[in-house]
Amino acid sequence: MSKIYTLINICRIKFMIKVFGIKNCDTMKKTFTWLDAHSVEYKFIDYKKEGVVAEQIDIWINHVGWEKLLNTRGMMWRKIPDDEKLDLDEEIARRLMLAYPSAIKRPIIVCNDKLLVGFDADVFMTQLLA
């Protein structure tokens, strides 16, 4: 076993990677495939089934901003009534993400002090395996 691999495993044991998303989402399937192919251990939290608490959304907003978290291109966004999306700002975005967890971008990966939003194999390689 290489020293690099050993160090990576020590980091993974000490700092569990948490992956937030929706199990049946195509982007999540790509994420699971990538993580499994690179032997990355993680805990999956399905925020459609388990919900997401306001405190967690607040932490994410503080790290990356609501604009990066809110999925305004997905099907759920189109289903949200237009009057609920008027004058979109942080407070409204937060309320929408709590009411409609499927409107949160996927995946959200938390490891140590890192918060990764969306699937990007290159970012995963540098942030999760380095």
Could you describe each region identified by the protein language model?
Residues 47-127:
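Thiol/selenol-based redox catalytic cores and closely related redox-interacting motifs
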Residues 3-15:
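Short, Lys/Arg-enriched N-terminal segments with co-localized hydrophobic residues
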Residues 14-16, 104-105:
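A structure-centric signal for secondary-structure junctions around beta-strands
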